[in-house]
């Protein structure tokens, strides 16, 4: 007997004997004894334990839920089919009408056609909308199916004909975005799901964050479900699979993945020589997820019941994806010959069926009843997440144009015969005369279809997608005076990282917002001096702490609790950033603003997970990113991979990311208080903050009077070293500001040059302000000229800027400073380990290099002799012929 007859019991009596024996052992002697016996048998038969259990990770290529287990469908299948067909049609027309304008707009037809049934079952029976109690279900729509969601919203009356006619035409403000983008459609889309892989990752941490809110008793999220709709090709992304074990660890029974297994990615089959459904089943099952397969539609049920030999299931198991795809690109006769014809037993099963009936044998993802039962089952699962693997056909219903074709994803245009085929396939009531105009289907307001759509959505609380732009209940933001302990001179040396921790401690004592603070750490709390928070506010754990921590007797012991406030995400920057994003958008998804602070090694932020931070800009996130241990020369012992000299270059690429590089404790306090005001005060600005802090301890002075505005704007004059009328300006940020001050002293004392010292908290904000002024002036030639803020602070004397970042960072402002002579020093090149002094000499940002740069500018203006520059180079022992550190 073939070993592939997995589902066919050749000897039920023997099977029953084995089952009864094992049950008896378990009952009388326990599971451990049963396990011992099974392992003994495996050893005796020389089958490895791994190979034995491997078979449990992949089941037969049939539905998880049998037809006998199914419940009746609760909706009107006929009406829903008419609605679904109209949505399919309108989605296609939207793309074709846009393509007709010949604007090279693009658009995707095939992905939604393969998943329309899946979505419609959800819209009619599952998706709960935002309500008075909670934020409703949170849905991560697969990016490429956006036209289908627009098509439904159009039929609901939520989008106008003008809007859908402007699909991918957004500049004039009345179009629809190509994919889900909250930035572009702030009252519609909640979550950006492109680039691919971000959807599944963010959905996991969104579900975790809902549990966090629930367990901390901040908000009731118990009825909410997070859905992530994904493509089987998308599952190749590391982000798609990388966090699935987290979902199991956190027991996220509020999370459902629905993977549209149409077997195709952009260019061709996902796994042509294998079976992607089996691969995904093994992967998720092995991780601990509940796996529900929806492989075959109801038209297969009678054949499977007739299959007494097990040959049909064997055939289904043996057929690989490349073959399944080819079968669906042909016809019924081809399927009869090359699929059923493989075995006499299976050919016999279909002998009384016509070719058309064989062709109409449907896949599970196109059967509403099968999908309903899968989703219903998924909602009932407790203590673990669920993945539904729905077998579909890419380009379903598009016939020879795209159905099952490798080119399906690229189809943007369809000829008239193809359009007629689609019309007939879905019984669209449009005449041959009208079809050339590519008309939309519209339901009359009193029609059965229109009423049914609204009735079903009313039952579920309202419409989806929907996004809340501003939170409802105002927050009381602490005033700057609440941080007074950090505004005065500090008694002992400290780093700006410790200054941040002290700011955080003060906020955590503020009665109005303390419970809204979400400290997020990727396993570096002790590095940043934050271990004191462990006991103070606890580390969040969905199951509490079931062990006595090793350091229980210590003041700052490792305290986990269900109501813990800290999100400790382990060595997992992607996960930590995803938690930050969930918290940073809670104001919208939950109408409950949370204030996240994610602190991490600055080089492992934008460089490592920049795609997520770009998505955060799209999603209108509000919160704080703290790039700790920053600066190329400041994290001195960690070397090339850790020393950050470019995160500010990366952060400036995100338009709504506001970046600062403070040098003093009072600057940190002012910046964070201003961020709280801007993001969570009456303005509710859609921005987020990136603040770099350092691990170097030094003297922290008191805040000079009246500098608050300058700190927030990006620059203020710190001090002046007076000497003669000969003058230069020195400017710097972060760790290098002290080198600037030392250089000013040398210039004043040794060279009799008056030196103005400026603390530049944000070169990026200064540059943006300058660009805004220049743009305004260009477009308003008769209006009063706007002046860049930096020009109101600095003067025309030669200027030198030095930072612990690439020169490009300070170069941003060259065009806006009032001086004609401006020289920038920076840390271009790879980092390395040594003392801070040696590294600053190596990268040419030490006080001595700053002095030489200032003297050189004065020599260029003939204010001093070049000999002075040469002598300074010799005096400071600078090797003028050493290799450029950028190349070293």
Swiss-Prot record:
Q: What class of enzyme is it?
A: oxidoreductase
Reaction(s) catalysed by this chain's protein: N(6)-[(R)-lipoyl]-L-lysyl-[protein] + pyruvate + H(+) = N(6)-[(R)-S(8)-acetyldihydrolipoyl]-L-lysyl-[protein] + CO2
Required cofactor names: thiamine diphosphate
Sorted alphabetically, the keyword list is: Oxidoreductase, Pyruvate, Thiamine pyrophosphate
State the superkingdom: Bacteria
What is the annotated signal peptide range for this record? none
Xref: Pfam families: PDH_E1_M, Transketolase_C_1, Transketolase_N
Q: What does this protein do?
A: Component of the pyruvate dehydrogenase (PDH) complex, that catalyzes the overall conversion of pyruvate to acetyl-CoA and CO(2).
Q: What is this protein called?
A: Pyruvate dehydrogenase E1 component
């Amino acid at each position: 007997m073939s070993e592939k007859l997995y589902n066919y019991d050749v000897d039920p009596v023997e099977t029953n004997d084995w089952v009864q024996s094992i049950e008896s052992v378990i009952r009388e002697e326990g599971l451990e004894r049963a396990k011992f016996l099974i392992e003994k048998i495996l050893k005796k038969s020389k089958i490895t334990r791994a190979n034995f259990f491997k078979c449990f990770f992949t089941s037969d290529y049939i539905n998880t839920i049998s037809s006998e287990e199914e419940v009746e469908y609760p909706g009107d299948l006929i009406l829903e089919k008419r609605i679904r067909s109209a949505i399919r049609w309108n989605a296609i027309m939207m793309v074709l009408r846009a393509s007709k304008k010949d604007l090279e707009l693009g658009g995707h037809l095939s992905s939604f056609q393969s998943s329309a049934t899946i979505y419609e079952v959800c819209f009619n029976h599952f998706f709960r909308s935002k309500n008075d109690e909670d934020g409703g279900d949170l849905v991560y729509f697969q990016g490429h199916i956006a036209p289908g969601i627009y098509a439904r919203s159009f039929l609901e009356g939520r989008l106008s004909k003008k809007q859908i006619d402007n699909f991918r035409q957004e500049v004039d403000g009345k179009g629809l975005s190509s994919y889900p983008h909250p930035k572009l459609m702030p009252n519609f889309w909640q979550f950006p799901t492109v680039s691919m892989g971000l959807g599944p990752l963010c959905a996991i941490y969104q579900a975790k964050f809902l549990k966090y809110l629930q367990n901390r008793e901040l908000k009731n999220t118990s009825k909410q479900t997070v859905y992530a709709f994904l493509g089987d090709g998308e599952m190749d992304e590391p982000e798609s699979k990388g966090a699935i074990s987290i979902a199991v660890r956190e027991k996220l029974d509020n999370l459902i993945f629905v993977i549209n297994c149409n077997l195709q990615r952009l260019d061709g089959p996902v796994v042509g020589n294998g079976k992607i459904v089996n691969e995904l089943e093994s992967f998720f099952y092995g991780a601990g997820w509940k796996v529900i397969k929806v492989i075959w539609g109801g038209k297969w049920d009678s054949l499977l019941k007739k299959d007494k030999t097990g040959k049909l299931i064997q055939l289904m198991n043996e057929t690989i994806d490349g073959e399944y795809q080819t079968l669906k690109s042909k016809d019924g006769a081809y399927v009869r010959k090359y699929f059923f014809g493989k075995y006499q037993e299976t050919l016999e099963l279909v002998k009384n069926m016509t070719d058309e009936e064989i062709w109409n044998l449907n896949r599970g993802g196109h059967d509403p009843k099968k999908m309903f039962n899968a989703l219903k089952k998924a909602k009932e699962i407790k203590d673990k997440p669920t993945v539904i693997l729905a077998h579909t056909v890419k380009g379903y219903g598009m016939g020879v144009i795209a159905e099952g074709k490798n080119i399906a994803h690229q189809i943007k245009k369809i000829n008239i015969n193809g359009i007629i085929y689609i019309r007939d396939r879905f019984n669209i009531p449009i005449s041959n005369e009208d079809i050339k105009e590519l008309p939309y289907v519209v339901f009359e307001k009193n029609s059965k279809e229109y009423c049914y759509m609204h009735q079903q959505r009313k039952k579920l609380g309202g419409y989806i997608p929907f996004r809340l732009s501003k939170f409802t209940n105002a927050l009381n933001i602490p005033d700057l005076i609440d941080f007074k302990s950090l505004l005065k001179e500090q008694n002992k040396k400290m780093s700006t990282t410790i200054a941040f921790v002290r700011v955080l401690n003060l906020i955590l004592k503020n009665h109005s917002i303390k419970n809204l603070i979400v400290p997020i750490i990727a396993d570096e709390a002790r590095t940043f001096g934050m271990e004191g928070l462990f006991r103070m506010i606890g580390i969040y754990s969905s199951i509490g702490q079931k062990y006595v921590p090793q350091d229980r007797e210590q003041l700052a012991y490792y305290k986990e609790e269900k109501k813990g406030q800290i999100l400790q995400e382990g060595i997992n920057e992607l996960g930590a950033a995803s938690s930050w994003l969930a918290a940073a958008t809670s104001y919208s998804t939950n109408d409950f603003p949370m204030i996240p602070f994610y602190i991490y090694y600055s080089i492992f932020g934008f460089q490592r997970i920049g795609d997520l931070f770009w998505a955060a800009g799209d999603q209108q996130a509000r919160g704080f990113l703290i790039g700790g241990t920053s600066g190329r020369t400041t994290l001195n012992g960690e070397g090339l991979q850790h020393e950050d000299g470019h995160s500010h270059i990366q952060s400036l690429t995100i338009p709504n990311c506001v970046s600062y590089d403070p040098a003093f404790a009072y600057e940190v306090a002012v910046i964070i208080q201003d961020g709280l005001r801007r993001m969570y005060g009456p303005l509710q600005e859609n921005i987020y903050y990136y603040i770099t802090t350092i691990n170097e301890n030094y003297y922290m002075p008191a805040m000079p009077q009246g500098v608050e505005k300058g700190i927030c704007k990006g620059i203020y004059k710190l001090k002046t070293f007076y000497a003669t009328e000969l003058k230069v300006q020195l400017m710097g940020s972060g760790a290098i500001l002290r080198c600037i001050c030392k250089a000013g002293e040398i210039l004043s004392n040794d060279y009799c040059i008056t030196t103005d010292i400026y603390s530049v908290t944000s070169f990026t904000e200064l540059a943006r302000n300058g660009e805004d002024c220049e743009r305004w002036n260009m477009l308003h030639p008769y209006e009063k000229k706007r002046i860049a803020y930096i020009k109101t602070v600095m003067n025309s004397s030669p200027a030198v800027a030095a930072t612990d970042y690439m020169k490009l960072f300070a170069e941003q402002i060259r065009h806006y400073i009032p001086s004609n002579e401006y020289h920038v020093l920076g840390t271009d090149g790879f980092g390395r380990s040594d003392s801070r002094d040696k590294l600053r000499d190596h990268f040419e940002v030490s006080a001595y290099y700053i002095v030489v740069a200032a003297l050189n500018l004065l020599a260029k203006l003939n204010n001093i002799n070049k000999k002075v520059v040469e002598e300074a180079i010799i005096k400071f022992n600078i090797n003028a012929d050493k290799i450029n550190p950028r190349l070293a």
